[in-house]
């Protein structure tokens, strides 16, 4: 389950409009967080550094992480 990507999630849903691709990013992060929690593995927290603005405090998702995932998925 940790190998499920945001693209896998979007594909499973029959595709997502570009404006909603962030939803699959959040879905992938939520799945990863749930697996880590189930296994008792602590999640890394977001520190105020060069990671950019914190977008999702529940999962510690920064703006730069979302941008990175979008760039990776566009290849």
UniProtKB/Swiss-Prot annotation:
UniProt key word Signal: no
Keywords: Nitrogen fixation
Primary role: May be involved in the formation or repair of [Fe-S] clusters present in iron-sulfur proteins.
UniProt source species: Nostoc commune
InterPro entries per record: NIF_FeS_clus_asmbl_NifU_N
Gene3D superfamilies with a match to the protein in the record: 3.90.1010.10
GO MF term list: iron ion binding; iron-sulfur cluster binding
Keyword Acetylation attached: no
GO biological process terms held by the UniProt record: iron-sulfur cluster assembly; nitrogen fixation
Family the entry assigns: Belongs to the NifU family.
Protein name: Nitrogen fixation protein NifU
